[in-house]
């Protein structure tokens, strides 16, 4: 891959980064630099936000603009972002025009910045803003902010130089983002902790003005496959309007938890599983565990009573148990697990057995159980308020104490939890239960 670094003679931060890039490249040494890349440098007189068509001056595959970030908050920061204007062109470029984003490389650089970040600095995306936009090649800005002190800081310049030279793209899922402040906090966190890589990101204040044409442009210029919305950053009206446009344009929408739980599935396979889940239960979310490889996928039902009892007994333990299984679990929009799992078509019998075994193991460890052939009998013992009243126990703290398994003293008598409890049985038929250890 051919990479062109673009800087301005007007800019101290760009000069700082350029100096350290040249030093590192002149020093050689391939132990930490990403292999298979060549580099060239372009220096211009104008501010980079006005450097339209800069990619026409170089034989390159990627444009990385090195520049300063200025902010009234004066926070020491290292940032990446792609350029474009959702509305007017107040800072270069043209109105309603977006530049092509180097989405995967931008995420790789962000993650590398987090690794090399000097003490006292933070790293983040910035939302899409300013020019240039007249570019045919993928591009992004990497910046040092936010004052002259940081722009000329050798540690910051070296960190950025090391980061862009060592950045490695790692199976990203390209996304567009909506909502948040200038520093796109949620999108930054997602990109640092998952495969989610953002191209164009629209600030909260831009969302109300977006139309379907601009959303399609965000997708196309980012090479994105889905969208993420920072729901807490939008008011209800803007959220509903945006959600409607995404639905109309057929753009998949992912929640943060879905992005974090995609596993290593290729997007096409993940999307196929998502569509399968939606046919099982409209709007169902999916969470990938150790499902890998290729081949047809199929839904596998699990006894809903068995699953429900396992979840009530120990939901975190059940989730941990799924981690090693080649399955996807389904959940409702409010994150209640559904009694259907997705796995490879040729794994169904093994997965049914594994899921049954996991449920039974958890229930037996937490509940009073008995086994009769293929029947699992769960005995539920509960505090019975009526029995407590018959023993003269007044409602209130004594009820709570007995329900918590502690005896109480009433008029010199000890009332134990067993005296005021009732039991009931739940019987579940599980084929092959006698063979479970």
Predicted regions and their residues:
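N-terminal catalytic or cofactor-binding beta/alpha core of small enzyme domains
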Residues: 1-130, 134, 147, 154-158, ...
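C-terminal folded domains that constitute the principal catalytic or ligand-binding module
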Residues: 137-138
